[in-house]
Each structure stands twice: as structure tokens, then as C-alpha cells.
């Protein structure tokens, strides 16, 4: 690779041009997280560990958004890239820290700003106009393992409820979670560990369309007036990765 890593500051004793510490067999990703590009240098998305860290390059056909980190490594293309492809990736990669989702968490204002700066993104979704959100950083409020009859099964849940709404006052992380997700499918992974995954789909789109009850519709209408949101224009795809943990 001929492009230095923007994370070079994290390893001051290592050359910024030393891809995988010069040992891609044993150290495919020193930071443990990474964006993914195809062999033509196009951004594809992320594995289950997010945007940060050194990038992978793989054939587009082997990529699935949110795929496991191990699986992504198994599909990675080893060896040097053509200079023009490496440059293309390097330019895009260097700009990733400027994205609001680079840290894995998106505030309400960041979501609104992204929607306004990317009109019609939901109608024309691309890896670049989507946001990538880490489930580990979400607060699911009063949702508990008792809301899931089985593990490993997509289960519809309603995060926008009275107890969570009250609990979100003074808790911006919970407020951002219920604002973004509302009614959504989730999966309980381990009952003892209280681990869950957000099931990506139409319900995880970051939008302001009405539906799902009079209270929700009233809140959305008020929100759209306050923030000048046009639901026909504003909205984007949100891809949730990683594993979240319930409070109980």
C-alpha cells in the first residue's frame, strides 16, 4: 500500500506506510476495526466493528454489510494495490474521521444535519450517504430480556414508550436511541449476558415518516415543524453493527 494511515498517531514508533505492521498474515488489522473497499477502490461499508482502524480491500461479491470481522479478514485481498486505486482509497479513508458516525454514535442533531445535507438519500441509498451506528453505544432503556421469548429470533420491540420517554429526559444517549429507532426488530443473542443485535431493515431507516400510532404521529409532526424536516426529502439508511447490552 502506498498510502499512509490516518491513524499513524496511534503507533508513533511505526512507519505510517507499514501496512499491517509489515506482517499482513498475523496482523491484518492492528486496531481491530475497519472500513471495507472493493478492488476498484469504492467504499462498500463496514464489518461488525465499524469505521475506525485500517481498511480491508475485498471483492465486492464477498461483502455483506455488518459481516463479522473474521469473515471480512478471510475475504481480504492481500498484496499491493495499483497506485491509482490506493490513492482513491486513501483520499476517501482520510476523510472518514470527519463523518458524524466515525465514533459509532450519532446524536439527534447529527442525524438531522446529515439528513438535510444528503437530500433524497433514503430513495437513493449508497454506502457513503448511509450512517453506521454501533449498537454497543446505544441505551435501550427499560427494554429487558423478558421482552424476548427466544434467543436468535428477530423480535419487534417498541423503544418509543412512556417509560423510555420519561427516562430519556437528562439522558441524551437514551433519547438519541429511541429517536433513531422507535419501533424496530431486535434479536436477543444471550439471555444471561443480556446481549442484543439491531436487525437492519426498513425499520432502521433514519426518517420521519408517520405511522405506528397517534402519539408517535403527533410527535413526528411537531418534530418536523421544529426542525424543518420534509419526510419526502429528508432521511437516510442507518446500518447498525456490533452487539448491544440491555440493562436487565
Model-derived regions: residue spans:
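Short turn/helix-capping motifs enriched in Asx and small/polar residues
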Residues: 1-76
